[in-house]
From Swiss-Prot:
Disulfide bridge partners, by residue number: none
Residues at the catalytic site: D147
Gene this chain is encoded by: ackA
Protein name: Acetate kinase
Summary of the function given for this chain in its UniProt record: Catalyzes the formation of acetyl phosphate from acetate and ATP. Can also catalyze the reverse reaction.
Secretion signal span: none
Reaction catalysis annotation: acetate + ATP = acetyl phosphate + ADP
Cofactor: Mg(2+); Mn(2+)
EC id: 2.7.2.1
Any one GO molecular-function label of the UniProt entry: ATP binding
Cofactor mode of binding and number, as noted: Mg(2+). Can also accept Mn(2+).
């Protein structure tokens, strides 16, 4: 059984074709600059690149080219589109309606449209991608897998904001959380590595990329997470501010005479480690600048590490203890220095790190010592595989 996994952004599209017998990706691809001059599709099969450069005015044209690349006689991996048993779509926001993945039909599409107001940047391209696939592959079942779904198990006192209750009732203003598919995947892998049932464990998962969030997992369920109503909340990130005093936004509008759009740009695109360092949103650049003595770069890293450490401490309290901490995503998987700095100061939990093991980059590995009271893992995330597994489970019933 082969499943196509699609992740549509506003001007890009990532995809994988996964053979579910072996759970191996037969092909991985990226389409860039959709609707912009210089559109390009890059597909990788066994390390070999296949590139298509031609105008792609919309996502439908992009998906046409994806299917063309997959069945290409020389560079493709299937002989016919009928070999694709189902398509799994990453959808950022499922609102309160969806606590798990769902088979897509017209009713689901209407619900996704209703969620656009909750994710105006992310859900529209997700919807466009689904519509394009449904048009091009009308007989192939489609499944929506939501970033928010895993966090629908948050207790009401964790997701409710201390605002007038009618804002929640009438407008859906509450904590939703994101990166759910990643948190779900790495917590389950951690339990496998420990040889224990996830339902018997207390796990804190740290998805640390340009966007970053933490999740507290108890009895296999998300009980707390750092992102909120939007992916802006929580930790300091690459370009996002994370948690700040909300009155700062009023100050920016009233005193600095900034428009709502200008404030939005500042807090989403000009803040985080980029804003503090003035160097970059890429942690490799910031680490390099800090090593060369750039004080603002060092401060940016210190602030970032502090917010992660602070949140791990809070989630240990939420869980009443912790059995395992997992690092994943770009920074979590590849920066030994960041992992070390984040864990520095958590010795009271009984965490002991093996310095040699911690030097590993991008590998699935336990980096804690044998006598560490808390197990610490680096687990490369695989959201595409999780989407494919959900798609198989729903379509094979």
């Amino acid at each position: 059984m082969k499943i196509l996994v699609v992740n549509c952004g506003s001007s890009s599209l990532k995809y994988q074709l996964i053979d579910m017998t072996s759970e191996e990706a037969l092909a991985k691809g990226l389409v860039e600059r959709i609707g912009i001059e210089g559109s390009i599709l890059t597909q990788k099969v066994n390390g070999e690149k296949y590139i298509i450069e031609e105008p792609m005015k919309d996502h439908k044209k992009a998906i046409e080219l994806v299917l063309k690349a997959l069945v290409d006689k020389e560079h493709g991996v299937i002989s016919d589109m009928s070999e694709i048993a189902a398509v799994g779509h990453r959808v950022v926001h499922g609102g309160e309606k969806y606590a798990s993945s769902v088979l897509i039909n017209d009713e689901v599409m209407k619900a996704l449209e209703d969620c656009v107001k909750l994710a105006p940047l992310h859900n529209p391209p997700n919807i466009i991608g689904i519509n394009a696939c449904r048009e091009l592959m009308p007989k192939t079942p489609m499944v929506a897998v939501f970033d928010t779904a895993f966090h629908q198990t948050l207790p009401d006192y964790a997701y409710m904001y201390p605002l007038p209750y009618e804002l929640y009732e009438q407008n859906g203003i509450r904590k939703y959380g994101f990166h759910g598919t990643s948190h779900r995947y790495v917590s389950s892998v951690a339990s496998e590595m420990m040889g224990k049932d996830l339902k018997d464990l207390k796990v804190i998962t740290c998805h640390l990329g340009n966007g970053a969030s933490l999740c507290a997992v108890k009895e296999g369920k998300s009980v707390e997470t750092s992102m909120g109503f939007t992916p802006l909340a929580g930790l300091a990130m690459g370009t996002r501010c994370g948690d700040i005093d909300p009155a700062i936004l009023l100050f920016m509008e009233r005193e600095l005479k900034m428009s709502p759009d200008e404030v939005d740009t500042v807090i989403n695109k000009k803040s985080g480690v980029l804003g503090i360092s003035g160097v970059s949103s890429d942690f490799r650049d910031i680490e390099g600048a800090a090593e060369e003595g750039n004080k603002r770069a060092k401060l940016a890293l210190d602030v970032y590490h502090y917010t992660v450490r602070q949140t791990i401490g809070a989630y240990t309290a939420v869980l009443n203890g912790v059995d395992a901490i997992v690092f994943t995503a770009g920074l979590g998987e590849n920066s030994a220095a960041s992992r070390e700095e984040i864990l520095n100061g958590l010795e009271y939990l009984g965490i002991k790190i093996d310095a040699e093991k911690n030097k590993q980059r991008g590998k699935q590995i336990e980096i804690s010592t044998e006598d560490s009271k808390v197990k610490v893992f680096v687990i490369p995330t695989d959201e595409e595989l999780m989407i494919a597994r959900d798609t198989k489970e729903i379509t094979v019933k």
